Amino acid sequence: MTILFLTSVNDEKRHCFYDFPGARMLFDDPKDLDAETLASVDAIFGNPSRDLVEKCANLRWIQLNSAGANKYSWLPEHIVLTNASGAYGPAISEHMLGCTLGIMKNLFRYHDLQKRKDWRNLGSVRMLETSVVLSVGAGDIGGHYLHKCKSLGAYTIGIRRKAHEKAPYEDESLAFSQVDDVLPRADIVALSLPETRETIGFFDYRRLSLMKKDAILLNVGRGSAVVTDDLVRIVNEGHLAGVHLDVTDPEPLPEDHPLWNTERIYVTPHIAGRFNAEVTLDRVLDIFSKNLAHALKNEPFENVVDRSIGY
């Protein structure tokens, strides 16, 4: 089996893959490989372009280094697509928790005051132990976030596509169809949704209006889940205490986009995940290693993407 690595790894991590019998590893830039070599590739580790996939005539498996797989709806059915779901939850949920506390404790506002040398008490702050935290999307990322919030005393509610037995860190577990009923109860609403037909534009002006006036909104899933113009409008109208977006629509944000300068909206450039935490890369490599072992033994893969739902 010939595997083309598109995921950048150092020499130490590369050596971990030399011990797989029957596996030939290609760490070259695809641009440096001739047509015959590309045609011999059986598997790709990384997120290939459509053009590259079409050059790999023998391709049978792609192991993405991301959890999201929505960009691969065009992939031929005979190619197995596996994702890296399970690798990103710890790092992204820490980012979410940091941003949650930054808003609740006025830390971002105090930083603005510091730049102006303004020594002033901004008054009351909020506590997680008296908050209701709702995660719309309660898989790897949302689940880790709820777990962290629960450990700090929050009342936690997880929303999944279908009704599900509640996890130990959940006080309630609800179905996606119940989101409108529970939004008015939540002090913090965290979105970690994949991009599907059902989730695009899901949080529009009507749903944002269902949230408490002083609620906090976080989005770390896909920017398309929130109608950006509606979000800017409702925040400018005085609704929502704070918003953190690690994902936006569009991405990257144009320099003149209103999200940059809207009060109480805080943006990070889609960096909560990626490989900024080395442990995340290690987890992705572990998922790939397990699936490579399965492939070499003709065993079923883990983390197979369900094409019917997009993740």
Enumerate the language-model features and the residues they cover.
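Phosphate/diphosphate ligand-binding glycine-rich loop within oxidoreductases
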Residues: 39-114, 122
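NAD(P)-binding Rossmann-fold cofactor-contacting core
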Residues: 151-169
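Rossmann-like adenosine-cofactor binding region
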Residues: 163-258
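Rossmann-like dinucleotide-binding domain for NAD(H)/NADP(H)
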Residues: 214, 220-311
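Glycine-rich NAD(P)-binding loop of Rossmann-like domains
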Residues: 110-144
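Short acidic low-complexity segments
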Residues: 28-37, 50-54, 170-185
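Short loop/helix-cap segments at secondary-structure boundaries that form the rim of catalytic
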Residues: 14-20, 34-38, 52-57, 71-78, ...
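N-terminal glycine-/charge-rich "phosphate-binding" loop or analogous flexible N-terminal tail
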Residues: 1-41, 181
